[in-house]
């Protein structure tokens, strides 16, 4: 009877609160104590941890009238207002508290008659609101309603404290107090203990999804044991489904990312091409697809249209504006054109090569061309003649040009004795060549005719070319450049080995003895040793002569 009288005398609340069942029960106990109602519990009970915490809240600076040490948060002024808890009018009128054990905060209008239909509308999910839900967003403080004090004086009001937007953890009362005050029957004790177990299981994770729904039979039992407090659970369910702080704290861009559709990677390339090419690519979004096979040039393929400006020239004229002119049209001559001077860059490379070839066709003193036809051979710096040319020379076909010719056989004496070309001289040592040609140089009787020297060995590969170069070097050293005693020197291509099979009649004796003959091994070693010694002596003599000149 006392409970019904209190509930009828209280004014309806201006807005719903977010406190759970245990906090509501504690507030009801405080109201019963202040109204001096008869309750079957001893006033001398010891303070429980929850009661001690409530006493500590009452001694805060917000209840003593001092200015709280907290900056005013104006970030969520646009949110929906929530009622602020106040103390009882009786307690505010009296300047002191009666007893620390009975000092609790009173909430105006804990029950709302118009919320009964909400509990009937969704009875199954009313039980889910009993379990605590912890929101991860920053709590935003709500404004006071029209019946309360203005928000501008909120910090200077000592009897008020700020109600956070997030759901507070339920304040647990001791089991003995609950049994003695709220549940005189065994049924209520069992229900509250079951409720406490469910709440402790949910508190295992601070961030959790909606708890699993209970079956229908268990919901009916819980709704019967709520003793008329089902309205609070419907209010909690609505606030859990639509939390005002969680949506308010999200920015516009974050809300678009969470609610918008996922980007599709298969975007048409034509949409990407619409982007400006001049835009910087340094900060391109990673989600935007990029065309990998884009052309490197602006126009990789030249159009085939003949009327494009690419195929038309424009000639600038001082007397007339620009006029297009076809490429195939011949340009008009403007007066007398100056002749460009000849430079090395304008000379054709072929002309240079021809001049080089012309110089190579000249004899050693660059006065005349070679009298005999030459061919290319192994050594590019020497002039070669064939066996046919030598045979023609021996037959007198070049008597009009050649006054006298010398055939020098550079083979060893045993090779020369085994078979040689007619009228050939055997000079296999450098000293012999020097003594024969340079001590008393030979000159032609007629200036118009030539003096020719032809070298050869077995293959004309080593000994013949070496002797030819030696004579040219000694001749250069004995004369002033480019004068020479013997400007025309030749090599027989293929040597005696190729000449003998074709022209045996020009050889005497008509035989051929190779250098590595089995019968002349000792002679080969002896002549090689003499040649090496003579070469060493010659080098020493040259060094002495150079030192004497210094």
From Swiss-Prot:
Region (Disordered) location: 76-98, 285-335
Keywords per UniProt: Cell cycle, Cell division, Hydrolase, Mitosis, Protein phosphatase
Gene Ontology CC terms: cytoplasm; nucleus
Enzyme class: hydrolase
Biased composition (Basic and acidic residues): 290-310
Function: Tyrosine protein phosphatase which functions as a dosage-dependent inducer of mitotic progression. Directly dephosphorylates CDK1 and stimulates its kinase activity.
Annotated EC: 3.1.3.48
GO biological process: cell division; G2/M transition of mitotic cell cycle; positive regulation of G2/M transition of mitotic cell cycle; positive regulation of G2/MI transition of meiotic cell cycle
Catalytic residues (UniProt): 457
Protein name: M-phase inducer phosphatase 1-A
Family matches, as Gene3D superfamilies: Rhodanese-like domain
Lineage: superkingdom: Eukaryota
Listed GO MF terms: phosphoprotein phosphatase activity; protein tyrosine phosphatase activity
The reaction(s) this protein catalyses: O-phospho-L-tyrosyl-[protein] + H2O = L-tyrosyl-[protein] + phosphate
Rhodanese domain segment(s): 401-508
Family: Belongs to the MPI phosphatase family.
InterPro entries: MPI_Phosphatase, Rhodanese-like_dom, Rhodanese-like_dom_sf
